[in-house]
Amino acid sequence: GGYAEFTLADERYCFSLPDNYADAEAAPLLCAGLIGYRALVAAGEAKRIGIYGFGAAAHIVAQVARWQGREIYAFTKPGDADGQNFARELGAVWAGDSSAAPPQELDAAILFAPVGALIPQALRHSARGGTVVCAGIHMSDVPQFPYSILWGERSLRSIANLTRSDGEAFLDIAPKAGVKTEVETFPLTSANEALERLRAGTLRGAAVLMIG
């Protein structure tokens, strides 16, 4: 992160970006994509994956998961028909409100939406042995839930950081998987507008702030 035009960094902690992405298209790969990929790895070999919150990270992860032959079930905030249609365009086999039940039990779920109340819902929709991965930095409080929805060797975990090997693997996979980032650019002076659009859930894909 950061908006300096020039910086000095240890090359051991830098990644080479794929050549076939313009700067704005590559920008979402470096946060949303990297953390999203680590969350996907944390989901293990799950075949049916639920994604709660279909924004910047989700629209990238969905493409990688589909390339890997997995099924994506997308959950958006209630009434977000545009977000659900976007998920279907990217290959989701089902898309619906976060309050809805998917047509099949999930092997894993990834939560990008910072809503603690979604954790019990994701657990209820997960098969025995399933994993629920919380990929956000912040989340509202998780409500009390019965042990029975965690029982059955279901697991609940969070994602906080990524490793260099995660980054190298993802940036190698992204062009092979044909990942296309959908971005809306804003000048840096319109950062507050971009944040408001993000909060309102009216962005399709990712917002990218341009310095120049």
What is the meaning of each model-derived region?
Residues F15, G50, Y73, T131-V133, ...:
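Structural detector of well-ordered beta-strand residues that form the stable sheet scaffold
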Residues A135-M139, I159-L162, F186:
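Short strand-turn motif at the edge of the Rossmann-like AdoMet-binding core
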Residues A43, Y73, A81-S155:
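Glycine-rich cofactor phosphate-binding loops and adjacent beta1-alpha1 units
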Residues P120, R164-G212:
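C-terminal hydrophobic helical "lid"/dimerization subdomain
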Residues G1-C14:
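Glycine-rich phosphate/adenylate-binding loop and adjacent beta-alpha elements
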Residues G53, T76, A113, G136, ...:
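Short beta-strand/turn micro-motifs composed of small residues
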Residues R48, I60, R70-E71, G83, ...:
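Terminal helix/beta-alpha structural elements that buttress the NAD(P)+-binding lobe
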Residues D19-S99, P103:
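Mid-domain Rossmann-like dinucleotide-binding core that forms the NAD(H)/NADP(H) cofactor-binding site
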